[in-house]
């Protein structure tokens, strides 16, 4: 089907994401706030977070179309949190417009602070709201640890708009009271 034709074939391997993707970053050389391990108390977790973000960024970079004269490509990070993924994409591709969509107001505030600290207000927009509320341009929709039905929503949003997507679902750990719920009882798009 249409969706199957658009899914990038990938193979599992035992390499860390950074090594498997070929994208190597000097974390110390990045602007303050782009390292997802900053503020993390657990070294193992911060290392895994870096690997996950780099693996996703490599996939996103390969999906972004070339810049045209009419407008820059737009990457929309759904469930963006404080912007770890979207902001790193913006750093790697400064010609791209990045939109961070996050429903939690406190986390939106953190994302806005990070955008302001980086001085990227002109090319990164933070929208505090749900995916259904976003009606702007989108060339690539992305989501890392897209909780609950958000993975389905991102795929639906992108296939409806005929844009690319790179999504990594989560373990459904944040669906309150979902223990023993059947598929028909979970939120669905």
Task: Give the residues covered by each predicted segment.
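Class I S-adenosyl-L-methionine
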Residues: 1-189
């Amino acid at each position: 089907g249409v969706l199957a034709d658009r899914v990038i074939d990938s193979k599992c391997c035992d390499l860390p994401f950074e090594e498997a993707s070929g994208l190597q970053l000097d974390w110390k050389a990045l602007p303050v706030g782009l390292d997802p391990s900053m503020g993390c108390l657990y070294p193992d977790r911060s290392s895994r977070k870096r690997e996950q973000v780099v693996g996703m960024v490599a996939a996103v970079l390969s999906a972004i179309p070339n810049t045209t004269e009419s407008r820059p490509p737009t990457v929309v990070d759904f469930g963006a949190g404080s912007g770890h993924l979207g902001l790193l994409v913006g750093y790697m591709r400064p010609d791209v417009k990045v939109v961070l969509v996050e429903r939690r107001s406190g986390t939106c505030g953190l994302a806005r602070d990070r955008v302001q600290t980086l001085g990227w207000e002109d090319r990164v927009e933070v929208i505090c709201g749900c995916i259904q509320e976003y009606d702007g341009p989108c060339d690539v929709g992305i989501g890392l640890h897209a909780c609950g039905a958000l993975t389905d929503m991102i795929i639906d949003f992108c296939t409806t708009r005929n844009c690319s997507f790179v999504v990594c679902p989560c373990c459904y750990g944040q669906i309150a009271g979902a223990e023993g719920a059947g598929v028909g009882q979970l939120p669905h798009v």
